[in-house]
């Protein structure tokens, strides 16, 4: 008894494969159509050369004319290639300038916006409802103490202060001074 084996390819992959094959077929048809158009255009534009019955001088004149036409076409092709190269360089430079300008202007980091309770209620309920909610009313008020007023500033000769603070003794005084205001 043979057991039917399920396909290992999923449906999405099958769809992708069929789409890719369809696109490849379409590209192939476009390529063939382009080639046929090219052959038709060349047959229309370029008449067949009739070299039978021409003398040596007539053949040489024909060759000179063809060489002159080839030179003109080559010059045009060279000019067009030079223009293309110039344009591609210019496009590349402009792209670099755009990237450079993008890098110069940094976007500021977004900061958290504090919304008051009133504004939040207004946003939720709409502007019609006049609801005020003062959450700060029940809070205690604390006064700030001026630390500068408490400490008297010693004004004196700065040379004495420098001499007194130099060395290990000065370091000890600074350490003791830093301890004393916090302990009170």
Curated annotation (Swiss-Prot):
Which positions bear Phosphoserine? 55
Record's family?
Belongs to the troponin I family.
Provide the residue span(s) of the region labelled Involved in binding TNC: 1-45
Q: Which GO terms describe its cellular component?
A: troponin complex
Please list the coiled coil stretches.
none
Relate the protein's function as given in its record.
Troponin I is the inhibitory subunit of troponin, the thin filament regulatory complex which confers calcium-sensitivity to striated muscle actomyosin ATPase activity.
| Gene that encodes the chain | TNNI1
Identify the InterPro entries for this entry. Answer: Troponin, Troponin_I, Troponin_sf
Q: Describe the subunit structure.
A: Binds to actin and tropomyosin.
One example of a Gene Ontology biological process annotation: skeletal muscle contraction
* PANTHER family named among the record's database cross-references: TROPONIN I, TROPONIN I, SLOW SKELETAL MUSCLE
Q: How is it modified after translation?
A: In the muscle sample, approximately 25% of the chains were blocked. Pro-1 is probably acetylated. The N-terminus is blocked.
The ranges of region (Involved in binding TNC and actin) come to 94-115
| One Pfam family hit | Troponin
- Record's keyword terms, sorted: Acetylation, Actin-binding, Muscle protein, Phosphoprotein
PTM N-acetylproline: at which residues? 1
What is the native source organism of this protein? Oryctolagus cuniculus
Its taxonomic path starts at: Eukaryota, Metazoa, Chordata, Craniata, Vertebrata
Under Gene Ontology molecular function, one entry of this record is: actin binding
Which protein, by its recorded name, is this? Answer: Troponin I, slow skeletal muscle
């Amino acid at each position: 008894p043979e057991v039917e084996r399920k396909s290992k390819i999923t449906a999405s992959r099958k769809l992708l494969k069929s789409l890719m094959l369809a696109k490849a077929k379409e590209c192939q048809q476009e390529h063939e159509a382009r080639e046929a158009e090219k052959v038709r255009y060349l047959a229309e534009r370029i008449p067949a050369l009739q070299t039978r019955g021409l003398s040596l001088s007539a053949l040489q004149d024909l060759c000179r004319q063809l060489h002159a036409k080839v030179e003109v076409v080559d010059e045009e092709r060279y000019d067009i290639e030079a223009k293309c190269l110039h344009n591609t360089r210019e496009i590349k430079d402009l792209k670099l300038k755009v990237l450079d300008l993008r890098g110069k202007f940094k976007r500021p980091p977004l900061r958290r916006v504090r919304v008051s309770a009133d504004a939040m209620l207004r946003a939720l309920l709409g502007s019609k409802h006049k609801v005020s909610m003062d959450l700060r009313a029940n809070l205690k008020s604390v006064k700030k103490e001026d630390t500068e007023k408490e400490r008297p500033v010693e004004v004196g000769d700065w040379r004495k202060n420098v001499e007194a603070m130099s060395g290990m003794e000065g370091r000890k005084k600074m350490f003791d001074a830093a301890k004393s205001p916090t302990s009170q």
